[in-house]
A protein has these predicted regions:
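NAD(P)H-binding glycine-rich loop region in Rossmannoid oxidoreductase-like domains
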Residues: 67-106
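Active-site Tyr-X1-5-Lys
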Residues: 151-202
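Conserved C-terminal active-site "lid" loop/helix of NAD(P)H-dependent oxidoreductases
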Residues: 248-275
Length: 289
């Protein structure tokens, strides 16, 4: 099997570090990374997760890591071409704590620049785009999903959202709405490129659930879309293993197996044989209290 060269954007980030560490253990992959900054993700502080003194992000070897802004077209082009990258895992993005302008610039403009460059290279085979379960966060503004925010457990089963349900962004605040819309835009862009003549790059849009720094789930039904670090890595493994079988464009919800999860991962199981290894039952969470 030919060694695949994988480029991870946002490699210095929280999820980037998980995937760099995981994929680097596989001799079938040669892992590269780019990020605008080098430093421990702000997610640890935002989520009050303790870290050891001087803890640093897990990065590829220095000769395979580049300090690069995702909007720097020229540098990005050289990195992808010079290293003959085969697969791109696009994680680079700013969170909804930023301004609307910055979210649009990095998450939308940066993604378009990356897709533009990647789809013009014969050696690029696939892009795994880190979308988000927040693409459908607007459903929480209506029942039965709004009850989940209040931790009101439904007596009757409710319909899980599938990839066929139209995206609806959250309207909680302008930044959250901009973040949701930026992920919806990225998916639309991927669909557009995948249907264009002369482009052979496959696009997988992964609507990841709630991946937290502590890698634990709390008794909060709003967070029932939790995805463990182990299941995140399993999903990426399954996509890479099934690359040849995949359609040119696909969307997947990616979560662990938790009670009251409102996202349907059925096509993920059918296409990729993805079976979550982690999760929690509601009565187990109650017992721990």
């Amino acid at each position: 099997m030919m060694v695949k060269k994988i480029l991870i954007t946002g490699a210095s980030g929280f999820i980037g570090g998980i995937l760099v560490e995981h994929l680097s253990k596989n001799s079938n992959y040669d892992v590269y990374g780019i990020d605008k900054h080098i430093g421990l993700s702000s997610r640890y502080q935002l989520e009050n997760t303790s870290t050891s003194e001087g803890q640093q992000p897990i990065l590829p070897p220095k000769e395979k890591f580049y300090v690069c802004d995702i909007t720097d077209r020229n540098q990005l082009l050289h990195i992808i071409q010079d290293n003959q990258i085969n697969i791109i895992i696009h994680l680079a993005a700013v969170l909804d704590a930023e301004t609307v302008e910055k979210i649009n610039y990095i998450n939308c403009d940066g993604t378009k620049i990356l897709f533009d460059i990647a789809t013009q290279q014969d050696h690029v085979e696939m892009i795994i785009y880190a979308s988000s379960g927040l693409t459908v966060a607007g459903y929480f503004e209506n029942e039965p999903y709004s009850s989940l925010i209040k931790n009101i457990i439904q007596k009757e089963p409710f319909k899980k959202l599938t990839i066929n349900d139209p995206p609806i962004p959250s309207h909680v605040n302008p930044s959250r709405e901009a973040y949701c819309n930026s992920k919806i835009y990225g998916e639309q862009l991927a669909r557009q490129y995948s249907s264009s003549d002369g482009i052979n790059v496959k696009f997988v849009c992964a609507r990841f659930g709630w991946i937290n720094t502590a890698d634990t789930i709390t008794m909060d039904s709003f967070n029932s879309d939790w995805c463990s670090h182990r299941d995140l890595c399993q999903f990426i493994d399954r996509v890479l293993e099934n690359q040849l079988k995949l359609k040119r464009f696909q969307i997947y919800f990616v979560t662990s197996n938790t009670d009251f999860c409102w996202l349907d991962t059925g096509n993920c199981r059918e296409d990729l044989n993805y079976v979550p290894q982690d999760g929690a039952r509601w009565n187990q969470l109650l017992t721990k209290m």
